[in-house]
Regions:
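Non-catalytic structural scaffold of enzyme domains
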Residues: 13-409
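Bacterial N-terminal signal peptides
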Residues: 1-8
Length: 409
């Protein structure tokens, strides 16, 4: 490994024994020295929140998909904040800094290798990059940096980060800078459901895929949230892919009923990108209007105000609520804008650590040691090769606004 320490991440890891013992060593060491450069950056970051950006951090697909939703989101009245569309983008005038973690994703590999501590650490490091005001000018120039905005809100785009990093970030934020908003998709969906569906008495269902469910993400988030919301409980199911929306909805309700559930569901949290809650809600409304026989069999399981909720819906609501509370809207008369940054491998490491495509080999990526003085990735502005064909196809199909801005001629 090459000996490189980014100024953003410069922490000397030792056994100081400070802070929350449930956090990772990297975080405990940040909290143990309140005079350190890193701690000071956190404490002083984005003092004037109005000028700050909204960062979205995580794997490229999830990050760009969320950003695309926020570009045209119109769920609120921009004057009084009521949940009524007003024909104006909810995030008018705001800038989204998209930190696509190309170097380190996908994240499930860390869990397969039993290296969840490193996943938590890189989540914290990406958070630090989002609130910092510098990024590297080039992957091939480790010394030259350029300026960017610090972020007033940091959104984690992947559910994996809800379980592997969010708690550690919040340990830092609560100690050093409580007025920075950090939003986790899983925590945000649960909060939204609790706030908007009190009739459910904290009982909800989760629609996700087998890999996400098997990772323990929801069990981890629930164990944290139940301390605050004592009645919170959930059941998770994985409807089959490849069927029509109607069939998938019926499949979900069938799974819920098949284990003997009789209590009504107030909301279903949908964590199965690129599936959107509004599409499911529209299909469910059509089924009701058409008196669908299959739905009639399960309608007794749904409260009168039942709805599907996805990360984009819940996160947008939490962002708007925070900005109204802190009075940190930019008040610029403009459409929302985006800037894309990416994590990339540093140069100069052993040749066998790089894949033919220029990233890390899987063996190297998923077996890196936590709390090391050797930094292996850096943040740069969107490089030329960032959008490969697979990502372009994903954007063309699922994130048309981002596609038009960065891909379409």
């Amino acid at each position: 490994m090459l000996s490189i320490v980014s100024p953003t991440f410069m922490v000397s890891c030792g056994n100081h024994g400070a802070g929350d013992p449930s956090t990772i060593p990297f975080v405990r060491d940040i909290l143990s020295d309140t005079t350190s450069t890193v701690y000071e950056k956190i404490r002083k970051s984005c003092i004037d929140g109005r000028d700050g950006s909204i960062a979205i951090v995580g794997p490229s697909e999830q990050t760009l998909f969320l950003a695309d939703n926020f570009m045209t989101c119109d769920d609120f009245d921009n004057v009084n904040g009521r949940c009524i569309p007003d024909g104006l983008p909810d995030f008018a005038g705001e800038t989204f800094d998209l930190i696509c973690d190309s170097a380190n994703a996908p994240y499930e590999g860390y869990l397969k290798q039993g290296n969840d501590v490193f996943l938590k650490e890189l989540t914290v490091k990406n958070f630090l990059s989002s609130i910092d005001t510098v990024f590297h000018a080039s992957q091939f120039d480790k010394n030259t940096t350029e300026r960017k905005s610090a972020s007033k809100i940091v959104i984690l785009s992947s559910s994996y980060l809800s379980a592997f990093g969010y708690h550690d970030i919040m340990s830092i934020v609560n100690a050093a800078r409580p007025d920075i908003a950090v939003i986790s998709p899983v925590h945000s969906m649960f909060r939204y459901a609790i706030q908007h569906h009190p009739e459910a008495n904290g009982s909800f269902a989760v629609w996700t895929d087998e890999q996400t469910l098997g990772s323990g993400i929801y069990a981890t988030a629930w164990s944290e949230m139940v301390k605050e919301y004592k009645t919170l409980k959930y059941e998770a199911y994985c409807p089959q892919h490849g069927k029509s929306l109607r069939d998938r909805i019926i499949s979900f309700f069938r799974m819920y009923k098949s284990i003997g559930n009789t209590h009504k569901i107030g909301a279903v949290l949908v964590d199965d990108m690129p599936l959107k809650a509004d599409v499911l809600n529209e299909e469910l409304a059509r089924m009701r209007e058409n008196n669908d026989d299959s739905l009639t069999f399960y309608s007794g399981l749904l409260t009168d105000r039942f709805e599907f909720i996805d990360p984009a819906t819940a996160i947008a609501s939490e962002c708007i609520s925070f900005m109204r509370k802190e009075n940190c809207f930019t008040h610029r008369v403009a459409y929302p804008s985006t800037r894309i940054y990416c994590t990339v491998p540093v140069t100069g490491m052993a040749a066998q650590d790089y894949s033919p495509q220029g990233g890390f080999t899987e063996d190297f990526k998923y077996n890196r040691a936590d709390c090391s003085d050797f930094e292996t990735f850096m943040l740069v502005e969107k490089p030329t090769r960032f959008l490969d064909e697979n990502l372009k196809q994903f954007l063309r199909k699922n994130a048309q606004n981002i596609y038009n801005e960065y891909v379409s001629d």
